[in-house]
Amino acid sequence: MCSWSLSSHTLTSPVRQAAMEPKSSSCGGAGIRLRLLVVLHLLLLVPSSAMAFNYADALAKSIIFFEGQRSGKLPPGNRMPWRADSGLTDGAQYNVDLVGGYYDAGDNVKFGLPMAFSTTMLAWSVLDFGKFMGAELPNARAAVRWGADYLLKAATATPGALYVQVADPNQDHRCWERPEDMDTPRSVYRVTADKPGSDVAGETAAALAASSMVFRRADPAYSARLLHAATQVFDFADRHRGSYSDSLASSVCPFYCSYSGYHDELLWGASWLHRASRNASFMSYVEANGMQLGAGDDDYSFSWDDKRVGTKVLLAKGFLRNRLHGLELYKAHSDSYICSLVPGTASFQSRYTPGGLLYREGSSNMQYVTTATFLMLAYAKYLRSSGATASCGDGGGGARGEVSAAELVAVAKRQVDYILGKNPAGMSYMVGFGCRYPRRAHHRGASMPSVRAHPGRISCDAGFGYLHSGEPNPNVLVGAVVGGPDSRDAFADDRGNFAQSEPATYINAPLVGALAYFAGTTK
């Protein structure tokens, strides 16, 4: 397969490179390129089963992407050599250490809500599909720990406060700068009893709790610290209710407003704490507060903002495996959501592009594709382990009334294969995977010469020349999955089209689990 080798290249390509192909790619010259186009056209006509992908390679790259998003002091083994240390004084002006964590997407802000969600989903990927990760399991754990370390600092630095953001996004977005030499204000934002943020606190509790399970055997002392902090943060979220969007206003909106409110994060956080601690008080909380917090809501998406359907799938596991009848409602709602994704069922109500990609109106569609794919595979696992199916309602008129675990896996596989290259454009939407992939990801660090190639500072205004350049990115952000094509499968490889070309940690995090599953089960 035409693809970058993680062991044989520097992950950096020249700005001007013939045919925009990396030197270490096996893609050849003009004659080979023409033959490849013919072969690619033929490949699109063969059945899905005949178009094989190297899922293990895609898994490795989906994890290495997180190393390109790291903020702070980078370890010697960081596998994105064009990246360097950044944000080393974050929090210092407020006498708090907030060094580390992840930049969310293509900018240099550390947004707490999507970072916590990304960490939760990375942890869930390891918990449910870690056995399929093979040699990548240590790298996946390292990705979880990089996020969890930062969230632990943010949660414990100051009693009665949770630090939820570093940098003013309004100022950051006025510049196009590499993280290594950014000079925009590194303002710090926090939620307190007077300025609550139950949404971001609930998600942080979920992330810490899920991460504690990842390290329960590998590092018991660290695991215990994470779980203790998760319990405290959840208590803070529940005791001082309110949305961080109201408390912090334009500092977080419209960038990561909590549009769904905070009820979903409270139920999500309690559910993860129950799974991590096995403390019955958290299940009692779920049973007593579930309906008030959205257990009865109809919901058809799962994202950094809206956790309702993810919570239901998580809790449905308890019903399926342990027959906890207080959780039967969550099984019913999970069935409804899952069936809504599967064409031909009585409950089907999703939209797909002509090429077969799940599609939701709005920016960065791939975030919904990867979360839905993850939930289908997780739910398939829970159904299979209990010998159950998903009930889709009245199967009259030729519509199917139930869906099996195997059918869910097949639907999920089509989404993963679309991302990796089985689509009308014949391209991978993962940077560095395959012969054709996005060359102009909307990403500051990738789009500008690295500090190693160009040590001199590139100013705020000068950087915009790189944003608006039509040249491919000089640095390959290996493993990054971009926002993806539109409703007609059309994709503009345009750095200025952030809705389609910007990668994000919360796009990749759920995909890690899905790729692990197929890497471990596909022969």
From Swiss-Prot:
The residues that carry sugar chains are: 279
| A family per Pfam | Glyco_hydro_9
Q: Which Gene3D superfamilies match?
A: 1.50.10.10
Q: Where in the cell is it found?
A: Secreted
Sorted alphabetically, the Gene Ontology BP terms of this entry are: cell wall organization; cellulose catabolic process
Matching entries from PROSITE patterns are given as: GH9_1, GH9_2, GH9_3
Q: Which InterPro entries match?
A: 6-hairpin_glycosidase_sf, 6hp_glycosidase-like_sf, Glyco_hydro_9, Glyco_hydro_9_Asp/Glu_AS, Glyco_hydro_9_His_AS
Name of this chain's protein = Endoglucanase 19
Give the source species.
Oryza sativa subsp. japonica
